[in-house]
Amino acid sequence: MEDRIKISILMDYYRELLTEKQKYVMELYFNQDLSLAEISELTNTSRQAIYDIIKRCNKLLVDYEKKLNLARKNKELIKAKQIIIEKINDLEYSNNKNDFKNSLEDIKNTIVQYI
């Protein structure tokens, strides 16, 4: 189940790097949850060919992520955004000038670290 979720996420990032047939098969298999037999019937292709396409695409998507890291970078940006929002919220309730400066410094460090 976890692998299916991972591949679905990678499809969101790298779908356009696949051929039209690969996109179609992956869409049917992962998003519409069709079996290999159902996909092979729809595409007039052997079940083994569909299996091979899915395996090849899985490897391609993982390789793209290893090289480009788009999913990982996006996850880091979301984390940085959450940290910055939390620090800004802390600033709203800070009456102490030192706390204010420290929070600003934390925000700067977060921006430098993640962005």
From Swiss-Prot:
SUPFAM superfamilies: Sigma3 and sigma4 domains of RNA polymerase sigma factors
Spans through the membrane: none
InterPro entries (UniProt xref): RNA_pol_sigma_r3/r4-like (IPR013324), UPF0122 (IPR007394), UPF0122_fam_protein (IPR054831), WH-like_DNA-bd_sf (IPR036388)
Pfam family for this entry, one: UPF0122
Family, per entry: Belongs to the UPF0122 family.
Xref: NCBIfam families: PRK00118.2-2, YlxM
Job of this protein: Might take part in the signal recognition particle (SRP) pathway. This is inferred from the conservation of its genetic proximity to ftsY/ffh. May be a regulatory protein.
Protein name, as recorded: UPF0122 protein NT01CX_2214
Species name: Clostridium novyi (strain NT)
